[in-house]
């Protein structure tokens, strides 16, 4: 496995994706299922494939992804981040193009915690004058 496989770990919200890629025909497997089956929405599939489209490697690699935690959007973002890191592991010259597109940087936005005395993170109880 070492040598022919390149790997990368991606994170987004509360999702973590471990990505393994090797030379192949372009088959992407997420948690044992085809990417079309795993991500129901076309936008999630598009987000996950963005680094491959940018670097013209859509049908160059077979990719295996193990992803857990979070929802569909977070998992798609984590997969994108992981694929980006795996591509950089494969070829370091791709880093500048991927970095310019903003795929290398981890999106640090997380859900803000709920505070005591409020309905949610920022929503206060309804104010009544009388």
Swiss-Prot record:
Highest rank taxon of the organism: Bacteria
Keywords: Ribonucleoprotein, Ribosomal protein
PROSITE patterns: RIBOSOMAL_S9 (PS00360)
Record-level GO cellular component terms: cytosolic small ribosomal subunit
InterPro entries listed in its UniProt record: Ribosomal_Su5_D2-typ_SF, Ribosomal_uS9, Ribosomal_uS9_bac/plastid, Ribosomal_uS9_CS, Ribsml_uS5_D2-typ_fold_subgr
GO molecular function: RNA binding; structural constituent of ribosome
Gene3D superfamilies: 3.30.230.10
Single Gene Ontology BP annotation: translation
Pfam families attached to this UniProt entry: Ribosomal_S9
Family: Belongs to the universal ribosomal protein uS9 family.
Protein name per Swiss-Prot or TrEMBL: Small ribosomal subunit protein uS9
Organism: Paracidovorax citrulli (strain AAC00-1)
Lineage: Bacteria, Pseudomonadati, Pseudomonadota, Betaproteobacteria, Burkholderiales
């Amino acid at each position: 496995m070492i040598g022919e496989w390149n790997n990368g770990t991606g994170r987004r919200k509360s999702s973590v994706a471990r990505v393994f890629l090797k030379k192949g025909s372009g088959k992407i497997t997420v948690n044992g299922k085809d990417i079309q089956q795993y991500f129901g929405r076309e936008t999630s599939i598009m987000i996950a494939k963005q680094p491959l489209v940018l670097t013209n490697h859509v049908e160059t690699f077979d990719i295996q992804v193990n992803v857990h935690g979070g929802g569909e959007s977070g998992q798609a973002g984590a997969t994108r981040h992981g694929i980006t890191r795996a591509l950089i592991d494969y070829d370091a010259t791709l880093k500048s193009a991927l970095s310019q597109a903003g795929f290398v940087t981890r999106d640090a936005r997380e859900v803000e915690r709920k505070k005591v005395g409020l309905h949610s993170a920022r929503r206060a109880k309804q104010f009544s004058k009388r």
